[in-house]
Amino acid sequence: MTAYTLETLIDREAIRDCLYLYCRGIDRLDEKALRAAYWPDATDSHGAYKGSAAGFIDMALVKLQQAGRMVHQISNVLIELHGNEAAVESYFTAYQEEKDTNGQAIETMLCGRY
């Protein structure tokens, strides 16, 4: 078992908060929460998108305006701290509602890793 210092526990909780902020931000299209989840110079490799986190947020906020309900959930968060850097892996489950070109509802369940 790893012995944690107060500082490492605080760091780990801050990382978890970023994951939760992302989920809340994307589900509610909350730009402030989304931007708070990333460093200003962060990059994102998110499905077909690969580029700056700011670019991903801008794209997602426009694309998802027409989406219905979204629910992102995080689990199995593994955080490895290495000095001033961290390696983080988490699993997600996401439910999304959209409409096809005929206006019919499409429900999608996604699972993966962040």
Residue ranges of each PLM-predicted region?
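Short, hydrophobic/aromatic alpha-helical segments in well-folded domains
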Residues: 18-21, 75, 113-114
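A solvent-exposed, acidic/Ser-Thr-rich amphipathic alpha-helical stretch
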Residues: 31-99, 106
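Conserved aromatic-histidine-acidic binding/catalytic patches
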Residues: 7-10, 102, 106
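Conserved helix-adjacent loop modules within structured domains
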Residues: 105-114
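Short, low-complexity N-terminal intrinsically disordered segments enriched in polar/charged residues
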Residues: 1-28, 32-40
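Soluble or luminal CAZymes and related metallo-dependent hydrolases
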Residues: 14, 71, 110
